[in-house]
Amino acid sequence: FTAGRHIGAMVSTEQEHWSLAGGVFGDSLTATNGAAHDQDEGWGLGARATFAPINEKTQVVHLGLGLNYRDTGGLGTTSFKQQPETHIGGINIADTGTISNVTDFYKVGAEVAIIMGPFSAQTEYIATSVSRNTATDLDFDGWYAQAGYFLTGESRNYKNGSFGSIKPKASVGEGGIGAWELAIRYSTLDLIDKDIDGGDVDSYTLGVNWFATPTLRFSANYVDVLNVNGGTYDNQEPSLFQVRSQWAF
């Protein structure tokens, strides 16, 4: 439901309490063959501004606003879909399918985040408006809210309008147990409007993150879809458990 990856150019600037970025983008990275590859996918604009009235080492208040505009060009179609809080499930529990006769669409997102020592919370809302040349325009939206707490006392790292990697107070291999975080998340997505029934989904996630070292992380998440209204998976309530290991260098 968020903006995908496209080839383009972007410029950005930042100071201690604010950041600003904007870019112009062309074709997507995913259309590598078939009809979509031979057609003009249009062009897009993207911009994001952030402001942190409080930006201390362990105390942060973050505000952000983003805008994404997309002209569909010769393709004239678009679609929106989402897996249930995972990238490996292979099932889009909310999916509009192909929306035809689309001239352009835009997305507006607002974000708020705070850090208070070992506690952090953030929320984001995204609204999408789709313009069609032979049918009524469409509106979709979604939002999430999440919170986390470090049992070992660390704080999330924040710089230039985004969160960075976690540095444990005492890493594994250096006499410590790393950084341990408990997390919770709630999200909702509504892809139903007019003649499009892509589904309305609500779900929550419980998670544990273990940062063994500054470059090694392990995560475990339990996701429960509370309900699906409409769409292909109407009235379904799936749940899943997923683990992840990550080495960054």
Please report, for each region that a protein language model flagged, where it lies by residue.
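Outer-membrane beta-barrel translocator/channel fold
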Residues: F1-A9, Q15, L63, L67-T72, ...
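Surface-exposed coil loops of outer-membrane beta-barrel proteins
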Residues: F1-K57, G64, L75-V102, Y106-K107, ...
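Short loop/turn segments at secondary-structure transitions that flank enzyme active sites
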Residues: H17, S28, N55, D71, ...
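Active-site-proximal beta-strand/loop segments in catalytic clefts of secreted hydrolases
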Residues: G23-G26, N68, I126, V223
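Extended hydrophobic secondary-structure segments that form protein cores and membrane-embedded regions
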Residues: V61-D71, A179-Y186
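Outer-membrane beta-barrel pore domains
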Residues: G76-F249
